[in-house]
Amino acid sequence: SPCQCWGNRRQDHTLKFKNLKMEHKALPLHAHLASLPVYQPGRPLEEVARELGIPFDRVTKLASNENPLGPSPKAVMAMKKAAESAHLYPDGNGYYLKEKLAALHQLEPSQIILSNGSNELIEWIGHVLLDNRSNIVVSQYCFAIYPIVAAMFGAQSKIVPATDFGHDLEGMLQAVDASTKAVFVANPNNPTGTLVNAEALRTFVSQIPSHVLVVLDEAYVEYLEDAADFVEVVRSGAIPNLLLMRTFSKIYGLAGCRLGYGMASTSLVAAMEKVRQPF
């Protein structure tokens, strides 16, 4: 019968595979991955609530700095409207959003790049700058993703001891060497919440050698009443090795949308666009 024939053929194939004498070798993974730990995210809130036997709405996840107020009702309405087009691929270039952001910050659209949260921007920095002969400079209590991404590309992280849980800018400046490709400063800092004096930060940025990318992570800058205006520096082109990172995850309450953006020189944005996935 057809069933018996199929069964016989399947058995023949199984025997052939069993009789194959293959030398199994491990995949040639990048050696530096051996020392790179897998990132361990926090447990789902639903699981924590179930384990503790408490209502879901009584669980607050502090580690991710999520906005407890949630998104604007207008944003919710816009997302509901967008869901009607979920069968279509989105505009990967984010044409209209880039136009709006450019108008807001008085920049050219070519000076703005959209990303899957600011986390993806950090990875693009790795793609365009880092290798196993390079290093980055970070503060002791920095955002964990900076050194993780550096390790992904085989680069070293030069970690400068903190001063009162904040950035020792002079120490970070001294740590820069010929192999340094990027320096990261989050202001306000995540996770310690410290703030670098605006004038001190301006001086620091101006002193970094031109071969080193200065990354100012401004994920929380909208919470400041009187923030230093580094967008003006990007606008003027005075320091072409400057990248500002922003996100819609924090003050706008849109963490689930995974939307961030960078502001930089047109040449740096063009380089990152080359490694940005179109879909």
Where are these regions (language model features)?
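PLP-dependent aminotransferase-like
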Residues: V128-V185
